[in-house]
UniProtKB/Swiss-Prot annotation:
Domain notes: The PRC barrel domain binds ribosomal protein uS19.
Protein name, entry field: Ribosome maturation factor RimM
Pfam families: PRC, RimM
MF terms (GO), sorted A to Z: ribosome binding
Keyword terms, alphabetized: Chaperone, Cytoplasm, Ribosome biogenesis, rRNA processing
């Protein structure tokens, strides 16, 4: 079963079993909805703990979650610094508009220029601000950083396992 990260528990909040979560998903409303199942991966633990969201509210830049069967701070303190994940069963394709993709769909694809030159494989996606940056691992060269803008990313072909790109001046 594949798991995908949706947030990190950074601390507890109050004494009634709430935790502060930094979301790393574009869909926090559905991922953290009451009744949702999340999997907490703790450091040095191979097996995740299954948690069901009992309540959710937003507070500053965090989501405050409580979980069924965990009514006090003592029940949730062990989850500090845990990574919250969902399974591929919880990913809904209707979350995405045409032309949008999950990170795991992009990472591993070949980056190919419009002229057919293979640049390398996309190894990670950075989110520094206005737009994502796709990092391409190039054999024998330093990594290539491709901004996720229409002028650079021309087409994503999941069936062929490649992304067609047009290198703008200064990118290479």
């Amino acid at each position: 079963m594949a798991y995908y990260t949706v947030g990190t528990i950074v601390n507890t909040h109050g004494i009634k079993g709430e935790v502060r979560v930094v979301a790393t998903t574009d869909f926090p409303e559905s991922r953290f909805a009451v009744g949702s199942t999340l999997y907490a991966f703790q450091k040095d633990q191979a097996t995740p703990v299954t948690l069901t969201v009992a309540s959710v509210r937003q507070h500053k830049n965090f989501y405050l979650l409580s979980f069924e069967g965990k009514p006090s701070i003592n029940d949730v303190e062990i989850f500090k610094q845990s990574t919250l994940k969902v399974t591929d069963n919880e990913l809904e394709s209707n979350d995405l508009r045409p032309g949008e993709y999950y990170y795991h769909q992009i990472v591993g694809l070949d980056a190919v220029t419009v002229d057919g030159e293979n640049l390398g494989k996309i190894k990670e996606i950075l989110s520094p601000g206005a737009n994502d940056v796709w990092v391409v691992a190039r054999p024998g060269k330093s990594d290539l950083l491709l901004p996720k803008i229409d002028q650079v990313i021309k087409r994503v072909d999941l069936d062929q396992g490649k992304v067609i790109v047009e290198l703008m001046e200064g990118l290479d």
